[in-house]
């Protein structure tokens, strides 16, 4: 039976974050608010949990799960060949609605799907998400919806779709933004905008003037 906590209530927030952290450590799924849409998350290093996440969404391994982190410093242990331009994007837009696709450390013991040696990583601008990520470490997080359905902007919508496949729901009210993050590939010499989202190409070009845009 799924448990739900109102993170706008101080007592519920404390209890909910504790229960969510425990659930993640047990390899279970949680739903959490972010600065874009609600996400469904699992321990990034627990293969079975990531598999459960993909199954709950009805999503295949060909659509690997992004990773959310609670601090830019966490990148040092996750990625390799991270350029100066990539760090400048981090400095300018994190925490926030920018996802960076980077090469992950080959020694990492995780299975996020068919990533081809890369990871899509982001630090969200949401206090509840950051508090949970700081407590449990990197999480595999995808939008908390069934594949093909709209990404949820509130906890009700997420729970209506995902039900008891999730152990803990953290209800932070409506999300402050309903536009997905922008995605930039920083594995290339010149970063490539793969998806224009909450951050426009014009804003990104203030940091990376030569930014290319995918067709």
Region locations from a protein language model:
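Active-site-adjacent structural elements in enzyme catalytic cores
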Residues: 1-215
């Amino acid at each position: 039976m799924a448990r739900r906590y109102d993170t706008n209530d101080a007592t519920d927030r404390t209890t909910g974050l504790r229960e969510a952290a425990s659930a993640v450590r047990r390899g279970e799924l949680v739903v959490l608010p972010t600065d874009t849409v609600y996400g469904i998350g699992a321990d990034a290093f627990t293969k079975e949990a990531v598999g459960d996440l993909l199954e709950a969404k009805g999503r295949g391994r060909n659509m690997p799960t992004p990773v959310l982190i609670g601090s830019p410093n966490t990148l040092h242990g996750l990625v390799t060949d991270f350029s100066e331009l990539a760090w400048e994007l981090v400095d300018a837009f994190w925490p926030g609605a920018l996802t960076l696709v980077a090469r992950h450390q080959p020694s990492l013991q995780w299975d996020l799907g068919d990533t081809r040696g890369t990871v899509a990583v982001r630090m969200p601008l949401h206090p509840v998400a950051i508090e949970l990520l700081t407590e449990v470490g990197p999480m595999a997080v995808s939008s908390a919806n069934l594949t093909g359905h709209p990404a949820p902007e509130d906890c009700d919508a997420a729970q209506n779709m995902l039900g008891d496949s999730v152990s803990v729901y953290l209800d932070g009210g409506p999300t402050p933004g309903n536009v997905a993050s922008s995605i930039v590939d920083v594995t290339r010499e010149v970063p490539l905008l793969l998806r224009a989202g909450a951050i426009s190409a014009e804003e990104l070009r203030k940091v990376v003037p030569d930014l290319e845009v995918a067709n």
